[in-house]
Amino acid sequence: VGEPATYWRLDAPDTFVRPYNENTLFGRWNYPLGVTMYGLLHTAIAIGSEDIKNYIKDHVQLCIDTLEYALWDKEQYGGATSIHNLLTSIDSLDDCGSFASMMLEVNKYLGLRDVKKVADYVGDYIYNHQSRLEDGTFFRKEMMHHFHNMTMWADDLYMSVPFLVRYSQFTGDQKYLDDAANQFFGFKKRLFM
């Protein structure tokens, strides 16, 4: 009943505004920023820098606050979104694990609003949708970049285990911690570790 949901409109018939995050760093969600922001967080804590803490919190909060729109944008217009294209089109741990793990760490130390919806979104992907071998070990089966297909990468441990451990603490659900531990057994069995 009524008009479908929209986000931003101009005062003109059938005219909509689609936000675009042109910034290469602030408000972006990606693997390298997850690693970098994690380091910055613990640096800020160690040196007592409120400026760095505020920057990190604002960055992560912007990602949380715009995810709902980004998912709507993808559904409404199709294809990659102009905001959070990796998070709305997850096909690997690269797209979600590092940043989501850092997000939970930021929440632990600085507090974030609505972090649960994003944590659950990523947790659902990793636990229920990420490709796995028969014993549950993460595996790259069919991905956007074909050279990844049918491969196993040791860095998938980094992109999964810290998130799963923090998510287990966040939710209080032991199954995520068990999954994290089992990843080490599966990777050790197959890789030179």
Label every PLM stretch briefly.
Residues 105-112, 124-135, 169, 173, ...:
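Alpha-helix capping at helix-to-loop junctions
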Residues 133, 154-193:
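Extended ligand-binding clefts on enzyme/binding-domain cores
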Residues 1-79, 113-121, 125-129, 133-136:
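Low-complexity, Ser/Thr/Pro/Gly-enriched N-terminal "stalk/linker" regions
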Residues 6-25, 74-104, 137-155, 193:
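Carbohydrate-binding/catalytic loop surfaces
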Residues 34-50, 98-112, 159-173:
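Well-ordered alpha-helical scaffold segments within catalytic/enzyme domains
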Residues 29, 49, 92, 96, ...:
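Solvent-exposed, acidic/flexible segments
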Residues 71, 84-124, 129:
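N-terminal glycine-rich cofactor-binding segment that shapes the pocket for flavin-like pterin cofactors
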